[in-house]
Design a protein with these regions (language model features):
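Short, glycine-/aromatic-enriched active-site segment of Class I SAM-dependent methyltransferases
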Residues: 141-163, 169-172
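A short His-aromatic
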Residues: 116-120
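A short glycine-rich, Lys/Arg-flanked "PGG" loop and its adjoining helix->strand segment in the class I
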Residues: 126-140
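Conserved N-terminal segment of class I S-adenosyl-L-methionine
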Residues: 1-107, 111-115, 125-128, 206-210, ...
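Active-site-adjacent helix/loop segment of glycosyltransferases
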Residues: 188-203
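Conserved S-adenosyl-L-methionine
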Residues: 179-189
Length: 246
């Protein structure tokens, strides 16, 4: 009982940090559009988005699919999402992804999307296996994670990250669960340079920016995104597209 109460308190604290970060990151609509451009050509049919937040990426790929099952643990964010997306195309569900995913037992998605989610799970193999079970045969996983394991530090720990990924480790994680790698590319190399200077701060990255600075970053994103196309640069994030083998 004591452990369950402790887990509940930790979940409440994590929810608060997560919700606050979502509020700040809402000042970066260009960032969410940038993320969506990295994978939207792979979207089709039924999409399962894990850790959807308030749907700030979802809104960009929604026209390309038939239905989205949008999953989050935070009820306030889900209410915001449900209010934004009417018409029955978005099925908002509350689930703690640290559990058995029983709330998603009926889901067989064509595409599963997990953006900055996998790194929050100590047992990432278990996470990928549960994700795999929610995919239809031949389904696709779209994954975005923090990149460069050498950058892991106090800021990651404060953000609830168990690790950062290198290309080889993310590829191996999915391939040992029966996926093939269609694409795996860095994103936001300029952001990685800035993160390196702040990685030892004991706080969430978004808290190191004032609202005014976030608005400036948002305005600069069309230029920052151009660096993704330059070879040989490591990004702040990795974006992978993995196909489930038949």
């Amino acid at each position: 009982m004591r452990r369950k109460m402790g887990d509940a308190r930790e979940l409440d604290r994590s929810n608060l940090v997560y919700h606050e970060a979502q509020d700040r990151m809402a000042l970066l609509p260009n960032y969410y559009a940038w993320i969506a451009r990295r994978f939207q050509d792979s979207v089709r049919g039924t999409v399962l988005e894990l850790g959807c937040g308030a749907g700030m990426v979802l809104e960009h790929y929604l026209p390309r699919c038939e239905k989205v099952v949008a999953v989050d643990v935070n009820p306030e964010l889900l209410r915001t999402l449900a209010a934004r997306f009417g018409g029955g195309k978005v099925d908002a569900r509350r689930a703690d992804l640290r559990g058995d995913w029983s709330e998603l037992a009926d889901v067989r998605a064509d595409v599963a999307v997990a953006l900055d989610v996998v790194e929050h799970f100590e047992d990432d193999d278990s996470f990928v296996e549960k994700l795999k079970a929610r995919l239809a045969p031949g389904g696709t996983a779209v994954i975005k994670v923090p990149a460069q394991s050498r950058l892991y530090g106090a800021m990651d720990k404060a953000s609830g990250h168990w690790r950062r990924y290198d290309a080889d480790s993310l590829r191996a994680l999915f391939e040992r669960h029966g996926f093939s790698t269609r694409a795996l590319r860095p994103m936001n190399p300029v952001g990685a340079w800035g993160y390196r200077l702040k990685k030892d701060r004991d706080t969430n990255y978004s808290k190191t920016f004032s609202p005014a600075k976030l608005k400036l970053v948002n305005a600069a994103i069309p230029v920052l995104a151009l660096f993704d196309h330059l070879p040989g640069l490591d990004g702040l994030s990795l974006v992978g597209i993995f196909d489930l083998k038949a």
